[in-house]
C-alpha cells in the first residue's frame, strides 16, 4: 500500500499519496476530499486510507488503447482537479454507461469515429432522456479533447456530432393553499425545516441540509446560503460531502429572515441544545453547528428528504410532487404576487437570467395581460371582455 498523509489547503483536506513509479521516480499525487477541515478529521482519514488501498499507478496511454480504457484513464487524470460531487457524477456515467457500451464493441481510441458516438447516443435515447445523453456527450467530448491535447488523435470526433435537443422543462408546483397545508402537516417532523427552507426560500436540497446556525443572524434577521451538504455514490460506496461552496457564485446569497421562520428556528435551536444535554456523550459531534440534524445530532440525510417527502404527502392526501418542486413553487408564488423575474433569479440563486426565464416564463401570465391591455389601448379598441 502506498504511503500517504492529509494536507490542509484553503480550508479543505487533501489526501496526498507518495509512490515510486516504474522508472524509479518519486511521485506525489494530490486528491481532493471535498471535506472542510473543521469537524471532518475522521472522515478525511477514512478517505485517505481508502485512496491508499485503491491506488493504482497511471499507465502510459497510446493511441491504440481501447476507447473504453481511455475513458477510465481520463477519470483518473481529472479526479484531483474537480469537486468530489462532480467527479462522482462523471464516474458513474463513464463506468456504468459509456465504458460498458464501447468495451463490448472493442473500438480503439484511434478508430473512434463520429458515427460510433452517434450510434451510441441513438441507442441511449431509446431508454433515457435527451438531457442524460447531453451529459454523456459532455464527458465524451472532454475526454476526447484531452486525447487531442496529448496528440493521441488528430481531431475530436465528438465535434461532428448532432447533439439531441434538450426538452423544455415544465416545472411542477404547489399553489398557496397547498404550500400552507404542507407547512401545517410537516410541523414537528424532521422534514419541517427542509420543507420550510425549500418552499419559502426556494433552497436546493443541498443548501437546505448544508445550512448552519452561524449562517443565520438573529440580530440582523438574515439567513445566508453559503454551505452545501450532499451524498454521492463513488466506487460502490455512498459518501457525505460537505462544502463551503454552492452550485455557482450566484447561489451564495443572503435573504431576509422573516418572523415566522425566525420563531421556529429559535425553538429548534433550543430543542437541539436540550437534546445535546440529555444525550451527553452519546450525542453525535460530527455535525455540530448544522440546522438539519436529528434528536441525537446526526445529519438528516439527503435520501431521507427525497424518500420521506413523498411519503408525507401520501399520508396526508396531498398531490405528489418532488422535494425540488418546492423551489419551483416558491418561484411561481413570487411571480403570482408581482415579483419581477430578475429578483426571482437573485432569490433562487440562478447563475444567469436566462435560466430563470426559461424555466418560469410560461407562468408569467400577468405580464401578458398587461401587454394585451396596452395593445388594446394603443389601438383604441377598448378593454378586454
What are these language model-derived features?
Residues 134, 149, 153-155, 159-213, ...:
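Basic, Lys/Arg- and aromatic-enriched nucleic-acid-binding interface segment
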Residues 108, 159-160, 220-226, 322, ...:
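Short functional hotspots where side chains directly engage DNA or cofactors
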Residues 220, 231-252, 259-261, 267, ...:
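C-terminal secondary-structure termini that scaffold catalytic or DNA-interacting sites
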Amino acid at each position: 500500500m502506498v504511503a500517504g498523509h492529509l494536507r490542509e489547503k484553503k480550508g479543505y483536506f487533501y489526501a496526498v499519496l507518495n509512490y515510486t513509479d516504474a522508472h524509479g521516480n518519486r511521485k506525489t499525487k494530490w486528491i481532493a476530499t471535498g471535506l472542510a477541515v473543521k469537524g471532518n478529521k475522521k472522515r478525511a482519514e477514512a478517505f485517505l486510507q481508502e485512496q491508499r488501498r485503491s491506488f493504482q499507478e497511471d499507465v502510459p496511454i497510446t493511441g491504440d488503447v481501447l476507447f473504453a480504457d481511455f475513458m477510465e484513464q481520463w477519470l483518473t487524470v481529472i479526479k484531483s482537479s474537480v469537486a468530489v460531487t462532480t467527479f462522482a457524477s462523471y464516474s458513474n456515467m463513464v463506468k456504468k454507461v459509456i465504458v460498458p457500451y464501447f468495451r463490448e464493441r472493442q473500438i480503439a481510441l484511434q478508430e473512434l469515429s463520429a458515427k460510433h458516438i452517434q450510434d451510441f447516443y441513438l441507442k441511449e435515447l431509446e431508454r433515457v432522456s435527451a438531457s442524460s445523453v447531453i451529459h454523456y456527450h459532455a464527458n465524451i467530448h472532454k475526454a476526447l479533447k484531452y486525447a487531442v491535447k496529448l496528440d493521441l488523435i488528430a481531431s475530436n470526433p465528438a465535434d461532428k456530432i448532432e447533439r439531441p435537443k434538450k426538452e423544455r422543462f415544465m416545472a411542477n408546483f404547489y399553489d398557496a393553499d397547498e404550500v400552507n397545508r404542507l407547512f401545517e402537516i410537516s410541523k414537528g417532523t424532521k422534514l419541517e425545516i427542509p420543507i420550510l427552507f425549500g418552499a419559502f426560500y426556494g433552497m436546493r436540497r443541498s443548501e437546505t441540509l448544508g445550512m448552519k446556525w452561524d449562517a443565520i443572524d438573529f440580530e440582523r434577521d438574515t439567513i445566508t446560503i453559503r454551505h452545501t451538504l450532499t451524498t454521492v455514490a463513488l466506487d460502490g460506496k455512498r459518501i457525505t460531502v460537505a462544502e463551503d461552496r454552492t452550485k455557482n457564485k450566484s447561489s451564495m446569497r443572503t435573504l431576509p429572515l422573516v418572523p415566522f421562520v425566525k420563531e421556529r428556528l429559535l425553538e429548534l435551536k433550543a430543542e437541539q441544545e436540550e437534546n445535546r444535554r440529555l444525550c451527553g456523550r452519546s450525542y453525535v459531534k460530527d455535525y455540530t453547528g448544522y440546522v438539519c440534524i436529528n434528536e441525537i445530532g446526526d445529519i438528516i440525510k439527503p435520501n431521507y428528504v427525497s424518500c420521506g417527502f413523498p411519503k408525507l404527502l401520501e399520508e396526508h392526501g396531498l398531490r405528489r410532487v418532488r422535494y425540488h418542486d418546492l423551489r419551483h413553487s416558491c418561484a411561481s408564488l413570487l411571480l403570482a404576487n408581482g415579483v419581477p423575474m430578475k429578483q426571482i433569479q437573485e432569490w433562487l440563486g440562478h447563475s444567469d437570467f436566462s435560466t430563470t426565464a426559461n424555466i418560469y416564463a410560461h407562468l408569467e401570465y400577468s405580464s401578458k395581460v398587461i401587454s394585451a391591455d396596452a395593445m388594446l389601448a394603443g389601438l383604441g379598441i377598448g378593454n378586454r371582455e
